[in-house]
A protein has these predicted regions:
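Membrane-interface transmembrane helices that cradle and orient dolichyl/undecaprenyl
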Residues: 156-158, 195-211
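Short acidic/glycine- and proline-prone juxtamembrane loop motifs at membrane-interface regions
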Residues: 181-186
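Extracytoplasmic catalytic/substrate-binding loops of multi-pass membrane glycan-assembly enzymes
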Residues: 54-69, 78-98, 108-120
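Membrane-interface alpha helices of multi-pass inner-membrane proteins
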Residues: 176-177, 211-231
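Transmembrane-helix motifs of polytopic, lipid-linked glycan transferases
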Residues: 18-22, 123, 135-157
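Alpha-helical transmembrane segments and terminal signal-anchor/GPI-anchor hydrophobic tails
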Residues: 221-312
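Transmembrane and membrane-interface helices of multi-pass
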Residues: 166-172
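Loop-to-helix entry region of an early transmembrane alpha helix in multi-pass inner-membrane enzymes
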Residues: 108-119, 127-145
């Protein structure tokens, strides 16, 4: 972080808080209103804390490496806009003579999932004059909107548990620390919240179906692009929920009894095919999962199980 973080980040923070304030009436009710800005404050604090820990304790690390790569794209956009746009639109790892003077200096150019956060930071840099803390604030705000959307869905299902849901969604230190800064986890947390919201209101409750299904699709795309295993966990759970919802509405007992084995016979091969297609070319594919497990086991043996990872 630099002097411009101190000068510019507060301006963008004020903008985000004003935006949140203008939307509060539509996003809250009499029970949840008091948690709205608490949730946002914790996300913003998490963004600051993560940056400080990585800068002053670790002297660098993932978040600053992501920022480093996004700075290269931002500089390309300033120097040669057509080349910068090409970097943003090229498939990561593409050997393009026009972009190589920039991409050769990027740490994560060959990593498709990591380039999502790198590109997001570069695009935000157009607005924020590529200021680390301002970029982190925007990402934290996205995470906040997703988590708040999920909280609204939870409260709609179990209104009397609004206090417990508030604690679970907003106040867990590890969640608002790791899910608020310039990290891949921030995008995934926000996307997961929006996916749950879109699925519940669009598919289960059938409210504003088109809008909510589009939200669901966009959130699922982002999840699978950044951390595919999160989407792999969400989709089966959502499918089971949907099946149980329809099964409960069936009036004939025999039909209800026969539905489970029939659905399992259909769902298992479709599920396996879907997972295979989703993970194709990643280290979570059926062909690579054994090697991934072996690598993780060897690393844990070397580190004495002392390593920490949020996944790739």
């Amino acid at each position: 972080m630099e002097l411009k973080d101190v000068l510019l980040a507060p301006i963008f923070a004020v903008f985000l808080y004003v935006w949140a304030y203008l939307r509060r009436a539509k996003q809250t009710n009499s029970l949840t209103k008091k948690y709205y800005f608490l949730a946002l404050n914790l996300r913003m604090f998490g963004a600051i804390a993560l940056g400080f820990v990585y800068q002053f304790y670790y002297n660098g690390g993932d978040t600053y490496n992501f920022f480093h790569d996004s700075l290269i794209i931002w500089n390309a956009l300033l120097d040669k806009p057509d080349v910068g746009i090409q970097i943003l639109t090229d498939t990561p790892g593409t050997l393009n003579p026009a972009t190589q003077p920039y991409t050769n200096y990027m740490y994560f150019y060959v990593d498709k999932s990591t380039m999502i956060i790198v590109k997001a930071s570069a695009v935000l840099g157009i607005i924020t004059y590529h200021t680390y803390l301002a970029n982190a604030f925007f990402l934290a705000f996205f995470s906040f909107t997703g988590v708040w959307a999920m909280y609204r869905a939870f409260v709609d299902i179990y209104p009397m548990l609004y206090k417990r849901f508030a604690f679970a969604c907003f106040m867990m230190p590890s969640a608002f620390f790791w899910g608020s800064g310039l990290m891949k986890d921030t995008l995934v947390v926000g996307a997961l919240g929006w996916a749950f919201y879109g699925f519940y209101f669009g598919v289960i409750k059938k409210q504003k179906i088109l809008k909510n299904v589009l939200i669901l699709i966009a959130a699922l795309w982002l999840m699978q692009a950044v951390k595919i295993y999160v989407a792999m966990c969400f989709l089966p759970s959502a499918s089971i929920w949907l099946f149980l919802q329809y099964r409960a509405n069936m009036k004939v007992a025999l039909v209800r009894a026969l539905m489970l084995p029939i659905v399992l016979l259909i769902a298992l091969p479709i599920g396996l095919l879907t997972v295979s297609k989703l993970t194709e070319g990643t280290r979570y594919s059926f062909d690579s999962i054994g090697e991934t497990t072996k690598t993780n086991t060897e690393w844990n043996a070397v580190s004495g199980n002392a390593s920490y990872s949020l996944g790739e």
